[in-house]
C-alpha cells in the first residue's frame, strides 16, 4: 500500500540531490530501491512540496496537523502513515529544484551540510521536533539520529550565528512549548 509518491529534491544552489531518507539506519543515508524497481525508492519521509497523496490515504491516515505548520508537518504525517503500514515512494521520474533554508556564506550551509532558517522559524522546528520525540509512532532510529543533530545545530545557532540571541529565544521557547501541543 502506497501512501505517497514524492519527487527527487535537488538544491538549486548546490545542485546536490537529497537522498530519500531511511531512518532505521543509524549512520549514512542512501537510496534503497522499491521492490527492485529502477528509479523508485523506499523512503521514511517525503517533503510536502511536490508529493502526491491520494485522498483515500488522507482518509485513512488523517490530515496533516495544522498545529505543526510550518515545520515538520510532513515528517509527522509520514511517520503516521508508515506506522499504519503504508509505503512512501521517492521517484527520479519527477524532479523538484527546491532550496531548504536561507542562503548563507557559512561553508556548512553552502555545502548543504545543514539548513539554516530564520530565527522565527526555529521556534516551530524546535517545538515540533521535541513534540515528535515523545510520539510512539516516530521511529526510534530517527529519534536517535535527530536528537543529537538537533542539539548540535541549536548550539551552533545560539553560539555562532550573528542572530544568536534571536535563535536562543526561539529555540528555547519552542522546547518549552512542545508540551502544550495536543496529542
Protein language model annotation of sequence segments:
Residues 20-26, 106-109:
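Short, hinge-like loop/turn segments at secondary-structure boundaries
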Residues 34-54, 106-150, 181:
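Extended, non-globular alpha-helical segments
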Residues 134-183:
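Non-catalytic, C-terminal membrane-associated alpha-helical segments of glycosyltransferases
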Residues 51, 57-62, 67-97:
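A short, conserved alpha-helix in the catalytic core of glycosyltransferases
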Residues 75-76, 120-127, 169, 173:
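A structural signal for well-ordered alpha-helical segments within the folded catalytic domains
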Residues 1-20:
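Conserved donor NDP-sugar-binding/catalytic core segment of glycosyltransferases
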Residues 91-113:
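Active-site donor/metal-binding and catalytic loop motifs
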Residues 7-8, 24-44:
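Short, flexible, basic/aromatic active-site loop/helix in glycosyltransferases
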Amino acid at each position: 500500500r502506497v501512501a505517497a509518491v514524492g519527487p527527487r529534491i535537488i538544491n538549486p544552489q548546490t545542485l546536490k540531490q537529497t537522498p530519500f531518507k531511511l531512518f532505521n539506519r543509524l549512520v549514512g543515508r542512501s537510496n534503497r530501491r522499491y521492490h527492485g524497481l529502477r528509479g523508485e525508492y523506499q523512503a521514511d519521509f517525503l517533503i510536502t512540496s511536490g508529493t502526491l497523496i491520494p485522498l483515500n490515504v488522507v482518509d485513512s491516515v488523517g490530515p496533516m496537523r495544522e498545529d505543526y505548520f510550518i515545520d515538520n508537518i510532513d515528517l509527522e504525517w509520514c511517520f503516521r502513515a508508515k506506522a499504519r503500514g503504508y509505503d512512501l515512494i521517492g521517484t527520479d521520474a519527477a524532479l523538484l529544484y527546491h532550496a531548504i533554508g536561507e542562503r548563507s556564506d557559512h561553508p556548512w550551509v553552502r555545502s548543504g551540510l545543514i539548513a539554516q532558517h530564520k530565527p522565527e522559524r526555529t521556534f516551530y522546528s524546535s517545538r515540533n521536533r521535541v513534540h515528535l520525540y515523545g510520539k510512539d509512532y516516530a521511529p526510534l532510529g530517527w529519534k536517535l539520529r535527530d536528537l543529537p543533530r538537533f542539539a548540535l545545530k541549536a548550539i551552533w545557532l545560539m553560539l555562532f550565528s550573528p542572530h544568536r540571541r534571536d535563535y536562543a529565544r526561539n529555540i528555547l521557547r519552542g522546547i518549552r512549548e512542545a508540551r502544550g501541543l495536543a496529542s
